């Protein structure tokens, strides 16, 4: 028995040593393996991806390969070639890693999972007439949730809250009622669902990276179990209509032979996908407005000028707010686009330089660093400038340049050309409606006049819209 154990240990060490001897071949990206065999840069990468990858970019340029926990990951930071590279679905697979994350985070397996067909199905329900219907339903649900009685407000009295909690809870509850078709708008029940979702959401990065401890795992598992129960058709107030987005998704799962247990787990996946980003984004928008008086005045003036417009018209005629939103997303949208390299592949950067990728490696694109935080594209990229996406005449600014050449993307909050988030228009409508409602129906101010927006939680890099490490304390009351 002892000899068997020693043999296994010896073989493991041999594999690590042999795999760790990888060297850079001709025309491959710069290779940075780190100091620790096998582990490489995994700890630094997971702790703060933006800080680590920024350091690697300064050292190696727009493309490099790093070792992390036995994997070799090529990071591409040339935004002008994102589309050309990611469009090669024959060499780059997005399904395998998605399956890994689904298992780790949601404890679910969907053998027939097809991201492309799922995206096309979602696009059918989040554009055109369906989008208008969803937006109207969202607006009605938000108004119900923001009545004085629902918000616990009394005449002329101030109420204190954390801005992140306020924005996230309101948009989560609104989205839950709108997208999942739940008719039960009981305040206590909705709050309970939101609180369990937040318990789960806080631990999601650790679940994804398998760095969760025993106590945290128990908390996440308990929250998952409760959410699964609430998200079954019997847990919702009615069975989703087949022509609705949720109904079509359930039917797709059934057609693929997914059993009932896995279907309810898939509901939590969709809850997080549809509701995990709008609330945090609304927080950052409101946070930047409240801490930048000039931006707040400009948005208030724009809202006041459009009060007579219908919802659809008001959503389309807000260049100042749109610039605020784009600037906010530039600073806080930090998804990591990941693909597995299934066959040796050659890629060409925008400067004409060609590099080879190896089969079995992983490719990552991180738009947060480039183009969003690239100082050659955006002056003082770490600063919030509400008019960054406005021309002098207050029209939308579309042209941004790097080294004299126009860049295709000044920001990539919703994904690249062939990988756009299908729910982006609905998310923008929800964020706008919440911010407009807060600014027109309530007096809202910072508890500390000198407060600034909190720092980001670095563990959230790679998972969509960033979340703050703390909250921003505010007080608000009904406007008369």
From Swiss-Prot:
<feature type="binding site" description="axial binding residue">
    <location>
        <position position="421"/>
    </location>
    <ligand>
        <name>heme</name>
    </ligand>
</feature>
<keyword id="KW-0443">Lipid metabolism</keyword>
<keyword id="KW-0643">Prostaglandin biosynthesis</keyword>
<dbReference type="GO" id="GO:0005789">
    <property type="term" value="C:endoplasmic reticulum membrane"/>
</dbReference>
<dbReference type="GO" id="GO:0008116">
    <property type="term" value="F:prostaglandin-I synthase activity"/>
</dbReference>
<dbReference type="InterPro" id="IPR001128">
    <property type="entry name" value="Cyt_P450"/>
</dbReference>
<dbReference type="InterPro" id="IPR024204">
    <property type="entry name" value="Cyt_P450_CYP7A1-type"/>
</dbReference>
<feature type="binding site">
    <location>
        <position position="104"/>
    </location>
    <ligand>
        <name>substrate</name>
    </ligand>
</feature>
<feature type="binding site">
    <location>
        <begin position="338"/>
        <end position="339"/>
    </location>
    <ligand>
        <name>substrate</name>
    </ligand>
</feature>
<dbReference type="GO" id="GO:0005506">
    <property type="term" value="F:iron ion binding"/>
</dbReference>
<keyword id="KW-0644">Prostaglandin metabolism</keyword>
<keyword id="KW-0479">Metal-binding</keyword>
<comment type="similarity">
    <text>Belongs to the cytochrome P450 family.</text>
</comment>
<feature type="binding site">
    <location>
        <position position="277"/>
    </location>
    <ligand>
        <name>substrate</name>
    </ligand>
</feature>
<dbReference type="GO" id="GO:0020037">
    <property type="term" value="F:heme binding"/>
</dbReference>
<keyword id="KW-0444">Lipid biosynthesis</keyword>
<feature type="binding site">
    <location>
        <position position="110"/>
    </location>
    <ligand>
        <name>substrate</name>
    </ligand>
</feature>
<keyword id="KW-0456">Lyase</keyword>
<dbReference type="Pfam" id="PF00067">
    <property type="entry name" value="p450"/>
</dbReference>
<protein>
    <recommendedName>
        <fullName>Prostacyclin synthase</fullName>
        <ecNumber>5.3.99.4</ecNumber>
        <ecNumber>4.2.1.152</ecNumber>
    </recommendedName>
</protein>
<feature type="binding site">
    <location>
        <position position="362"/>
    </location>
    <ligand>
        <name>substrate</name>
    </ligand>
</feature>
<dbReference type="GO" id="GO:0004497">
    <property type="term" value="F:monooxygenase activity"/>
</dbReference>
<keyword id="KW-0256">Endoplasmic reticulum</keyword>
<dbReference type="GO" id="GO:0106256">
    <property type="term" value="F:hydroperoxy icosatetraenoate dehydratase activity"/>
</dbReference>
<comment type="function">
    <text>Catalyzes the biosynthesis and metabolism of eicosanoids. Catalyzes the isomerization of prostaglandin H2 to prostacyclin (= prostaglandin I2), a potent mediator of vasodilation and inhibitor of platelet aggregation. Additionally, displays dehydratase activity, toward hydroperoxyeicosatetraenoates (HPETEs), especially toward (15S)-hydroperoxy-(5Z,8Z,11Z,13E)-eicosatetraenoate (15(S)-HPETE).</text>
</comment>
<keyword id="KW-0276">Fatty acid metabolism</keyword>
<dbReference type="GO" id="GO:0001516">
    <property type="term" value="P:prostaglandin biosynthetic process"/>
</dbReference>
<dbReference type="InterPro" id="IPR036396">
    <property type="entry name" value="Cyt_P450_sf"/>
</dbReference>
<keyword id="KW-1133">Transmembrane helix</keyword>
<feature type="transmembrane region" description="Helical">
    <location>
        <begin position="1"/>
        <end position="21"/>
    </location>
</feature>
<keyword id="KW-0349">Heme</keyword>
<keyword id="KW-0413">Isomerase</keyword>
<keyword id="KW-0812">Transmembrane</keyword>
<dbReference type="GO" id="GO:0016705">
    <property type="term" value="F:oxidoreductase activity, acting on paired donors, with incorporation or reduction of molecular oxygen"/>
</dbReference>
<keyword id="KW-0472">Membrane</keyword>
<keyword id="KW-0408">Iron</keyword>
<keyword id="KW-0275">Fatty acid biosynthesis</keyword>
<dbReference type="InterPro" id="IPR002403">
    <property type="entry name" value="Cyt_P450_E_grp-IV"/>
</dbReference>
<comment type="function">
    <text>Catalyzes the isomerization of prostaglandin H2 to prostacyclin (= prostaglandin I2).</text>
</comment>
């Amino acid at each position: 028995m002892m000899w068997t154990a020693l043999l296994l240990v010896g073989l493991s060490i041999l594999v690590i040593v042999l795999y760790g001897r990888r060297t850079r071949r001709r025309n491959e990206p710069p290779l940075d393996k780190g100091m620790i065999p096998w582990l490489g840069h995994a700890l630094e990468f997971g702790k703060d991806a933006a800080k680590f990858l920024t350091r690697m970019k300064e050292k190696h340029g727009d493309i490099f390969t790093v070792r992390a926990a036995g994997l070799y990951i090529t990071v591409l930071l040339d935004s002008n070639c994102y589309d050309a590279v990611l469009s090669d679905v024959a060499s780059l697979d997005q399904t395998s890693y998605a399956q890994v994350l689904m298992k780790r985070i949601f404890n679910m397996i969907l053998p027939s999972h097809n991201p492309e067909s799922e995206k096309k199905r979602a696009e059918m329900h989040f554009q055109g007439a369906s989008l208008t219907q969803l937006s109207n339903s969202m607006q009605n649900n938000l108004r119900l949730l923001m009545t004085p009685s629902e918000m616990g407000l009394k005449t002329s009295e101030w109420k204190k809250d954390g801005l992140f909690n306020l924005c996230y809870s309101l948009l989560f509850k609104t989205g839950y009622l709108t997208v999942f078709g739940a008719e039960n708008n009981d305040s206590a029940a909705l709050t309970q669902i939101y609180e369990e979702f937040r318990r789960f959401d806080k631990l999601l990065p650790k679940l994804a990276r398998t760095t969760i401890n025993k106590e945290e795992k128990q908390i996440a598992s308990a929250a998952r179990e409760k959410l699964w129960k609430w998200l079954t058709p019997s847990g919702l107030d009615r069975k989703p209509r087949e022509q609705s987005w949720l109904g079509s998704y359930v039917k797709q799962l059934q057609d693929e032979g997914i059993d009932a247990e896995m279907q309810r787990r898939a509901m939590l996946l969709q809850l997080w996908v549809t509701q995990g980003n709008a609330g945090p984004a609304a927080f950052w928008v409101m946070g930047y407005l409240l801490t930048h008086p000039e931006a707040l005045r400009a948005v208030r003036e724009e809202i006041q000028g459009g009060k007579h417009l219908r919802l659809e018209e008001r959503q389309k005629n807000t260049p100042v707010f749109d610039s605020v939103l784009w600037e906010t997303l530039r600073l806080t949208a930090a998804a990591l686009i990941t693909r597995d390299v299934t066959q040796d592949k050659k890629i060409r950067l925008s400067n004409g330089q060609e590099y080879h990728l190896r089969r079995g490696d992983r490719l990552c694109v991180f738009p947060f660093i480039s183009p969003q935080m690239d100082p050659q594209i955006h002056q003082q990229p770490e600063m919030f400038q509400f008019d960054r996406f406005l021309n002098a005449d207050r029209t939308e600014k579309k042209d941004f340049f790097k080294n004299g050449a126009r860049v295709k993307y000044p920001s990539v909050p919703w994904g690249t050309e062939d990988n756009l988030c299908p729910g982006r228009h609905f998310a923008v409508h929800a964020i706008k409606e919440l911010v407009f409602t807060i600014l027109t129906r309530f007096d809202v101010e910072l508890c500390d006049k000198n407060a600034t927006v909190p720092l980001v939680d670095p563990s959230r890099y790679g998972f969509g819209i960033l979340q703050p490490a703390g909250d921003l304390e505010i007080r608000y009351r009904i406007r008369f």
